[in-house]
Amino acid sequence: MRHGDISSSPDTVGVAVVNYKMPRLHTKEQVLENCRNIAKVIGGVKQGLPGLDLIIFPEYSTHGIMYDRQEMFDTAASVPGEETAIFAEACKKNKVWGVFSLTGEKHEQAKKNPYNTLILVNDKGEIVQKYRKILPWCPIECWYPGDKTYVVDGPKGLKVSLIICDDGNYPEIWRDCAMRGAELIVRCQGYMYPAKEQQIAIVKAMAWANQCYVAVANATGFDGVYSYFGHSSIIGFDGHTLGECGEEENGLQYAQLSVQQIRDARKYDQSQNQLFKLLHRGYSGVFASGDGDKGVAECPFEFYKTWVNDPKKAQENVEKFTRPSVGVAACPVGDLPTK
């Protein structure tokens, strides 16, 4: 893991995260013009950072937040579509990979709300991963939720997963990506104040807990409703920050992520190898007791057993110590039911 140079190497993936200024857009043509601006940014960053392999833009960087419901539907994208074609051409032209936001992506059933989607485009202009946000930021966001994570071979073979903003507040999604083999988890977010310190902290903790690289791209600026705090960052698999932006609009950070180092750590580290130890629980004591050398593999967590085997029961259980309705009468949001 290296930070401070503009290069990359056969073993290192050059990654840039962009503090993109949150746009406020209303029409399809405005969205497409913004896509063309993002394409220009890619060309400029590649010129300044010749080692660049992967560039990452924040959630909402393409469409902005459509606070008007009809505008949200009118500007929703198809994948592939006009927006993705612009991004694909920019990646191909500049020989880089890119992560781009689509808020939203049209639902297969036209009357249902769109998805909040990320795409990973390779240096040939091909879409190699499409991820739909599993955990939209309720009660404000009204995206239709996605239902799974993905892992693909990224630049130089580094295994990449995509997650979005509020997803990252749930340890389960990080662990799911990591346990499926992800070595770099990309978190694109449009996160606003007041949650700045919590969001800076959680990505470092999740990198450490899951022995994975983390790249965060966050929005900056004020869109008339929210103020976005930036702090796009790149975190090493040991939880240390390699590079972090401030609140500056359109700032960026860059680091080189070693493919070999993370694989070496996952293979040879012992006391802090959380991924291995979770599925080989207590192996030292089990071995010393003469019960084999693999530890205990069974899941000891009652909540997860219930969730998998009886989701409705798990839902009822959490409502017993939280609340039975999605809305809250003391602070209503829209027309969400409060009883």
UniProtKB/Swiss-Prot annotation:
Keywords recorded for this protein, A-Z: Hydrolase
Catalysis: reaction(s): a monocarboxylic acid amide + H2O = a monocarboxylate + NH4(+)
Assigned EC number: 3.5.1.4
Gene3D superfamilies listed in its UniProt record: Carbon-nitrogen hydrolase
Single Gene Ontology MF annotation: amidase activity
Enzyme's top EC category: hydrolase
Active site: E59 (proton acceptor), K133 (proton donor), C165 (nucleophile)
CDD domains assigned to the protein according to its UniProt record, in alphabetical order: aliphatic_amidase (cd07565)
The UniProt record lists the keyword Hydrolase: yes
Keyword Hydrolase set for record: yes
UniProt cross-references to InterPro entries, sorted A to Z: Aliph_Amidase/BUP, Aliphatic_amidase, C-N_Hydrolase, C-N_Hydrolase_sf
PROSITE patterns documented for this protein: CN_HYDROLASE
Domain CN hydrolase: 13-259
Family matches, as PANTHER family: ALIPHATIC AMIDASE, NITRILASE C965.09-RELATED
Task of the protein: Catalyzes the hydrolysis of short-chain aliphatic amides to their corresponding organic acids with release of ammonia. Also exhibits in vitro acyl transferase activity, transferring the acyl moiety of short-chain amides to hydroxylamine to form hydroxamates.
Family: Belongs to the carbon-nitrogen hydrolase superfamily. Aliphatic amidase family.
Protein name, per record: Aliphatic amidase
Source organism: Helicobacter pylori (strain P12)
Organism lineage: Bacteria, Pseudomonadati, Campylobacterota, Epsilonproteobacteria, Campylobacterales
